[in-house]
């Protein structure tokens, strides 16, 4: 019987949970705003972790400024992660902005716009046929 989840997937899920707790409770930085961890990808040797995050930016905050602030805390976060998870080697954590939500909304808006234009054209074509 094959395994449903590989070790890297299990470690990835656990890292996501622990990082969310660390960011919520331990990291105090007003520049961050609200951070959501959307995914964690761990290398096969468990030495590196790519953490994909999204931000709820308030005021003058931009995703780039929030990401820069978060990257300043990478070493501290890795140290706290090492205390929470028992692994031979604590993965080196790198944060990346996940723009899939923004792109998905943009694509949805484009589709809605095209559908609305198509409905208007159909109504106009229907009126011309009646005349």
From Swiss-Prot:
The keyword Cytoplasm applies. It is found in: Cytoplasm. Its main location: cytoplasm. GO terms for molecular function: ribosomal small subunit binding. The keyword Cytoplasm applies. It comes from the Bacteria. Monomer. Binds 30S ribosomal subunits, but not 50S ribosomal subunits or 70S ribosomes. This is Ribosome-binding factor A. It comes from Vibrio vulnificus (strain YJ016).
